[in-house]
Every structure is written in C-alpha cells, then in structure tokens.
From Swiss-Prot:
Family annotation (NCBIfam families): circ_KaiC (TIGR02655), PRK09302.1 (NF006799)
Names of the cofactor(s): Mg(2+)
Modified residues (Phosphoserine): 427
Full protein name: Circadian clock oscillator protein KaiC
Source organism per UniProt: Prochlorococcus marinus (strain MIT 9313)
Details of cofactor binding: Binds 2 Mg(2+) ions per subunit, one in each domain. Mg(2+) is required for hexamerization and phosphatase activity.
Lineage of the species this protein comes from: Bacteria, Bacillati, Cyanobacteriota, Cyanophyceae, Synechococcales
Domain remarks in the Swiss-Prot or TrEMBL record: In the homohexamer the 2 domains (called CI and CII) self-associate to each form a 'donut' layer; the compactness and local conformation of the domains varies over the cell cycle and impacts function. CII has the autokinase and autophosphatase activities, both CI and CII have (weak) ATPase activity; CI has the clock pacemaker role.
Phosphothreonine: residues bearing it: 428
Keyword list, A-Z: ATP-binding, Biological rhythms, Hydrolase, Kinase, Magnesium, Metal-binding, Nucleotide-binding, Phosphoprotein, Repeat, Serine/threonine-protein kinase, Transcription, Transcription regulation, Transferase
Record GO terms (molecular function): ATP binding; ATP hydrolysis activity; DNA binding; magnesium ion binding; protein serine kinase activity; protein serine/threonine kinase activity; protein serine/threonine/tyrosine kinase activity
Family per similarity comment: Belongs to the KaiC family.
Binding sites annotated in the UniProt record for Mg(2+) 2: 291, 314
Subunit structure: Homohexamer; hexamerization is dependent on ATP-binding. Component of the KaiBC complex. KaiC interacts with SasA, activating its autokinase function and leading to RpaA activation.
GO biological-process terms attached to the record: circadian rhythm; regulation of circadian rhythm; regulation of DNA-templated transcription
Amino acid sequence: MQSSSAGGSSHMQVQKLPTGIEGFDDICHGGLPSGRSTLISGTSGTGKTVFSLHFLHNGITQFDEPGIFVTFEESPSDILRNSASFGWNLQEMVEQDKLFILDASPDPDGQDVAGSFDLSGLIERINYAIVKYKAKRVAIDSMTAVFQQYDAISVVRREIFRLIARLKVIGVTTVMTTERIDEYGPIARYGVEEFVSDNVVILRNVLETEKRRRTVEILKLRGTTHMKGEFPFTMGTHGVSVFPLGAMRLTQRSSNVRISSGVPNLDEMCGGGFFKDSIILVTGATGTGKTLLVSKFIEDAFRNQERAILFAYEESRAQLLRNATSWGIDFEEMERQGLLKIICAYPESTGLEDHLEIIKTAIGQFKPSRMAIDSLSALARGVSLNAFRQFVIGVTGYAKQEEIAGFFTNTAEEFMGSHSITDSHISTITDTILLLQYVEIRGEMARAVNVFKMRGSWHDKRIREYVITDNGPQIKDSFSNFERIFSGAPHRITDDERA
C-alpha cells in the first residue's frame, strides 16, 4: 500500500510507504519514501531497534508485506525474545516465511577478520533473502556496528553505499539504524552515515528536570514533504506511538446538545449547561471545591446512564470514594454498574507522553461519554512549559476527536486575589472556564464562582457566592453590594455610589 506526496505531476511524485506506526505517518505526510533508505539515528536506548522491528511488524500484519531484518549486534534469539514484550509474535512470522532474520552479528569467539573489508557476501545474502521471501521492507541494525569492526571508514562508507544502491535497485524500502553520541550533536557517530541515506530520522531521549522525554524529528525526506520539529513519542506495550500534535486538524464536529454540570444553578449560569463535546476548565485555589464539581459532573453522567472516566493525580481512590460519599455521591455503586472507571497515579510515576498514552488507551477501551482530570496542575510539576502545553493539546484534541466532554481542574497558586490562567496557554484550548475563589466579606471567608468564558453561548457574567453543604455546592445570589471581588480587596458599594 502506497501513497503519493503532495505536489508535482503524478508520474514524478515520490511514492510513500506507510509505516503503520501510530502518529509517525502523520508527521511524514503518509509514510517513508518507497524504495529508498531511511537512517534512524539516536543515542543508546532511544528505541532505534524497536522502531525498525515495528516497521517490519506492521508491514507484515497490516499490509501483507514480508520483511528482512539484518542484525549486526543482537542474536536472532535475543531479538525474538525482546520483541515478545510488545506483543509481537515474530517467531510465528519467521515460521510462516513472512519474516527472515539475517544474522550478521560478530563472531562470539572474537576472531579477527583478515583481508580488505567487503560487503559483497552480505549483499548477495540479503538479495537472495529478498527474492526468496518476496520482501518489500528491510531493516538493518545497526550501521555503527559495521564501523566498529573495521578501521577504514572510507572503505566502510563505500561498501555501505554499494549496499544501499543495490537495495534501491531491487526496490525495497529500507530503514537503517545508527548510533550518535549526543542528543543534539552530530547526526551519527562516524559522520558519514547520513550522507549515504536519502532520509534521516532522529530519535531522542532527553533528560528534562530529572525525567526522560522521548522525541522524534524528521531531519530530511529527500524529494518530499514532512512536518518540522520534534514530536513526543512513547514505547508502550504495543511498540512506538508518536503524538503528532502539529498534525491535528480542527475538523471535529460541533454539537449544540447540552449536558448538565450536575449543579442546576451552575447550568443556569452557563445558559443551560455545557455543550456535549466541550472542554471545561475549573481553576481555583486549594479547597475551593474543584473536586466537588468534578464529582457532580460524574454523578450526572451516572444519573443519565452514561459512562465516565476519572484520572486523579492528587488523591488516592480510597480518598476520592470517601470524599464523594460525604457529598452523597456513591462512586463505588457507579463502578459496580460499569459506568465509572477511576485511574489514580502519581504525576511523577512516568513522563507526560506516557500519561497521555495511558489516557488514550483507557478511553479507547472504556469508551466513556465524559472524562475528568483532577488535576492538570499536578501534571505540570517538574516538566517544561512546552511539554505540558503539548500534553494538554494532546488530551483536549483526543477528547474532541472522540466527542467526549472533558472536565479538567487547575489549582491556582494564589490563595486569594486575581491569578493568571494563561501561563500555560490552557485558557485558549478550553471552551468553558469556571473561576473559583476565596473572598473575605465582613471578616469572614466566603467562596465565589464566575463563568469566566463560554464559547458559543450566553453565560452569566456575575460573580456569585456559593457554599459547600452535605448535598454539594449551593450557588447563591451575586455579591451585589461589592465590587473588586476577585482582586482580593472587595469594596462595599454605598447607595450613593450605586446611584
């Protein structure tokens, strides 16, 4: 299966071969150039071998295209054993003649190779295997091992060029791995590998604030287009998953159907409730009632026999159940009926890309109509602003794609007074923003709520008082006799000033 790159006459277009790797085909605009070689470069542990095997595995399972894996480092038995952790039964593919592993690893006895370096024998073995198995895809792991075995770099470069030229004549699509020393240094260790390849893909595993963050960048795809920049990816139980945030399109449908927040007075403030496919952000200081609003939102889904999923990053499941019970909400009964799924995790337990993959997988399996994250600010701890922004875009984009109502909380740093909700650009991504805040009135602490923003709908612009009772939140009238409520210094308006 092949696709054409954009631009040019049809007979001159570079044909592309889909890799089948989630998200990767999006950033390379359809796949890798067919019949050409692609260099996969990265430091140790970035996932080069996994990427190569995933490329072959998908070719066999999704497109019925046999593949050849040439290994210069690991033994075939180790490759088969390691790949099983991703759920890939490569042994069965080998037995079905869909996959052939060509062992070119060094002699375990460590014998020196005499004479000049020549890949003629290996080239013929690869050529024979391609013809025998009718292979369309070839993976070579890794070119670095070839250079390490021989000192004459210029000769090795010449022989590798011969190998690539032969593979190009045969018409197979090839990926080759090579190791680099630094994440942002020279592309390859020996400085020549990238010049004998048509395309270059760089995998990185950068340490950011004590956490590793994997990214993939397409440096060049000769003769065709691709997306620029680095894109986060993970290596999960099913292999490589790329998150092509820049490739997301704003093409999702928009619903006029309203759903309830679970708080009648809040629905009135929102013009009749939230839109069915909207993203709602509740922001406020600790203790203002954000988790309570999440619980009411989930309870309303249960009341309508709809599924909801809650991702909690600040409280344990037992604590969530206890708190919900104190408000008259029975999360356990919802779980027993299969209408609620709660997933609790420490934000620091893994990287943001892995959290995003967990969220997408859980939603894909449970298929809820509503989701909630409590809270986004917990996930922002210890990560770069750009990584957090990409995570939020990934979550909201996926929720929009699946037409799921998303309810997210954000803890403000300021206990009282105005606070920013735009530092991480969250406000521009969400459809509705609810502000919760403490205010001091007549020497007592009170809570205030305001619908700060609601796309496509009228909403109440007043700042209203609300209290938390055993039955949940009760929204009262606005602070009609005060102004500058959210400034942290409310001022009472006299009758003369009102006039």
